[in-house]
Amino acid sequence: MTGLILAAGASSRLGEAKQLLVYQGQSLLERSIRLAFSVCQEVVVCLGAEVKQTVSIIEKLQKEFPSLSYVEIENWEKGMGESLSVGLKTIDSANDVLVLLCDLPFLTNAHMKNIISLANPERAIVASFQGVNSPPVLIPSALRPLFKNWSGDQGLGKFWRLNPMLCEIIHFSDKFRDVDVPEDREYWGI
């Protein structure tokens, strides 16, 4: 299983790169990489905005995680769908892929383990936090071709809305609160 972290965005609503924000002593990007490696053998990070700073975080972590790599998304401004499509193409087509975002500070290793415990070769496993569906999402290799032409602002939400029969929802009691606007920084103490 390969982890795919979507971390290419410019964080325009926040006003600064959320990948670089520090929470509990780690950048949100480092935190996401460590979460992914708690269940994945390799991890690919999609980069776009703030490439130099994010690459330095990745290079530091490659000493600990040699199977950590990154891909620069040429058209990252187009949206999450672009990162998802390009990122998936860099991963062996036989691999299941766990897709994560780097702006979800409430995620834990336990969430990751619960998600992969439901792995199903024919269905995506979608996390839901108090009714809000969100990555992490486990995409089995059999469903990866459905994302071949994903582009622009097509996030994963479109997938589970259009393909409910191909998805299994795992419900968590945690409140969904990502880091998108300055008030979220305050909430998380970042």
Report the location of each language-model feature.
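A residue-level structural signature of the nucleotidyltransferase/glycosyltransferase Rossmann-like core
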Residues: 104, 135-138, 148, 176-177
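Short, well-ordered alpha-helical scaffold segment located
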Residues: 111, 142-143, 175, 184
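Conserved alpha/beta core of the MobA/IspD/sugar-nucleotide pyrophosphorylase nucleotidyltransferase superfamily
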Residues: 149-190
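Nucleotide and nucleotide-moiety/phosphate-recognizing core
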Residues: 1-133, 164-172
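Short, glycine/charged-rich beta-strand-loop motifs at protein surfaces that mediate ligand recognition
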Residues: 102, 143-150
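N-terminal/domain-start segments enriched in small and hydrophobic, helix-friendly residues
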Residues: 15, 30, 144-147, 183-189
